[in-house]
């Protein structure tokens, strides 16, 4: 089982819901920094996205994370995909935990990573993965 907790009285006081959707060709997704809501850039949208409630999608893929920071000199100043965007994009695009790992890796490779160190716990009914990213 994978879950997510953030022990903060001022952050994460809401439950996120994103419905499943079909997107027209050429649609873009605007990415925002999870901590500051600052726009980071845009990436192409996929043709279909899955429903997400909290940090689990309609296929029971769930993602949690642990921030461990990273060395500042390793951070990618040109990256536009932060850890929060990676979590939601993976949930919207992946039907299994294994697919979520690939979605995250592909997005970071294509668009760069805009956060420090994160450890993602990604599970589905059949398997669980741990993925660490330092940026």
Regions found by a protein language model. Name each.
Residues 75-77, 85-94:
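Second-shell loop/turn segments in exported
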